[in-house]
Amino acid sequence: MSTAIRYLRLYLHRPAAQGGGRRGIGYLSQYGDILRVSFDEDYIADPQRPTLSLSYRGANEADTQQILRSARDARLVRTDGRWPAYFQNLLPEGHNRDRLARERGCAPDDEFELLAAAGHDLMGALEVEPVPAQEGVPDVVRYWHTTQGLDVLEPGFVEYPVEDAASLPGVVTKFSAVQDGRRYLVKRRGAAGSVILKLPTTAHPDLVANEFTCYQLAGSLGLHCAQARIITRAEAELPEAVPFDDILAVQRFDHLADGTRVHMEEFNQALGYAPRQKYGKGLLQDWATMLRVVDRLSDQPVQDTREFLARMVAFILMGNTDAHLKNWALVYPDGHTPRLAPLYDPVCVAAFFEGATEHQYAVNRAIDRSMRALGWDALQALIKTAGLLRIPRHLALLRDLVRRAQADWPALLADAPSTLQRTVQARLAGGVALTHP
């Protein structure tokens, strides 16, 4: 094996209230197929350390420090050429991954290079970049490899992040952009994007209209949503030609227009799952687990648990069968304490079942069967499993939400794609168990 080791400095941006700027918290390294995160000792020893992920927290401070110092914990090191799960979830998928690999000149499965390529525009307040060559191999990195019997002799070369490259998780084609007047620019001159531009697909040219309508449906119920609007192709300066007229522009809640970064993580990261495990352990169990996290750890638990339950019911009513663990998130406004992130990526996937073969959307169809069958007794049991109190009050609020959706959504669906109209109207008219007394 080559004795060259490559490494990146790992930073978290501080909240503006704490003076802003960024704090180094550790290093990411690659030695052959070994990919590891090594945290700085001052970060480990700081009881007020900024939160990278709930997956790195233990039951108490001593447990947390033990995790952060661990030599072999899978949350810190892997030997198969992949990042530990938290960092895997930062990487794009599908076309977005292929595009980033082309920009970097690396293979799509080279996870070290992909993360390094997009190091200045990652999800949340995280940033990574190469260490200046003259600094040599960081002691904390060299020490771990030496204790494992690995002969680390020389630093390998790592290029700086690709200008304007971004890592946006998900499979739908999207670009990171900034808004300049009425224009949306992907060529950002190195600035992190504050807007995500999402494109439709040839299979679903109405995807943008579908998602925008679902944002409107959710917003009409008072749910806390990311801000989204439909723009024309002429309003966006994209790096490549696209055959679509409409683009969905979504304001990021982790990267603000003034350059502020707010840390966030997907629930998939918080629970320690790899991207391929985004459907978790099943709809009801995952919802109960997320509810429990929000109730016990949020700095606004009453507001967030009510919001979470309302989103669950809204997703059932609108047929959003792709609300997996990567489409729910936590934000850390103070850099430490989580709260439920705004709603994002609401899509009526059930509308795509029409005209598809029975083998297409198999996972989503199975989820849809569970959603449509979920009645009030099962919902009550889920809330109880999550450990929430005042269950009758929660159920009363959710019953009222169903009535409001039945009253208000038909007007909002008037200009929606026809398949979306038919799908949601059928659900409101008795197609899901929650519309029954």
List the predicted regions and their residue ranges.
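Phosphate/dinucleotide-binding and metal-coordinating scaffold of catalytic cores
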Residues: M1-L325, A329-P437
